Amino acid sequence: MNKKSPNYFTSARKTFSKEIHSLSNLSKKINQKKYNEICELILNCKGNTVLMGIGKSGSIAAKTSSTLSSTGTSSFFLNAAEASHGDLGSLKKNDVLIIFSFSGETEEIIKIFSACKLKVKKIV
């Protein structure tokens, strides 16, 4: 049996190339003015920077919150499904809430959006 071994490094290099291309395209789609406004909101936040989502968007929000916390920004993740069952109480008036959603029409987020507006300083 003379089976040819796959070249894992070549496969990894192709994956890296695709990821670099995707990030390059993403950076072209981001509105620079809005991005800077969000950064200013986070930097000037007197409370917590709260990141909320559900599903895959929630996973990204949780990771982003963790990264913010590790850089000294007061931040925590709020699962949208849990929020409607009591966790909204963790939101305070000086907090900034950043909602992660692929569609912008997630039922769990829509259901609690009005309550969130009453509790925090700003929603992104």
Listing of model-derived features with the role each one plays in the protein:
Residues M1, N7-N44:
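An N-terminal, well-structured beta->alpha segment
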Residues M1-N2, S75:
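Intrinsically disordered, low-complexity segments enriched in polar/charged residues with Gly/Pro
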Residues P6-N7, T49:
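Generic detector of short alpha-helix boundary/capping microenvironments
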